[in-house]
Amino acid sequence: MIRDEYTAQEIAKELAFEAAQNREFLDYSIIRTGLIEAGVDPALYRGLEKTCFYVLLAEGLLEDTGEKTEVAGRSFKLFKSLIF
C-alpha cells in the first residue's frame, strides 16, 4: 500500500493528465478508481481530491465547468478537458 503523500500526489496528477487526454469531461471519481487500483492508502484520498487537478487547471489544460456530478452518493466537481 502506498502511504507516502508525495508519491500519491504524483500518481493522482498522472491519472488526471491521462484522463484529460482520453475524456472530454472528468471528475475525481475517475481518479479515485485509479488510486484504488494503484494501491494508494484511502486516508490520502480527500487531500488528493483537492490537489490533483490544480496543476492541469493552472496550465490551462482543464476548465472548471462549475457543475457537479454525483457518483455513489457523493458529488464531485466536473472539469472539461481542453486537450481531449
Q: What residues fall within each predicted segment?
A:
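Short alpha-helical segments that sit at the start of domains
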Residues: 1-25
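Short amphipathic alpha-helical segments
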Residues: 13, 28-29, 33, 50, ...
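Short acidic, hydrophobic short linear motifs in intrinsically disordered regions
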Residues: 22-39
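Short amphipathic alpha-helical interaction segments
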Residues: 42-58
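A short, conserved structural fragment
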Residues: 57-68
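Short, cationic-aromatic polyanion-contact patches
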Residues: 67-84
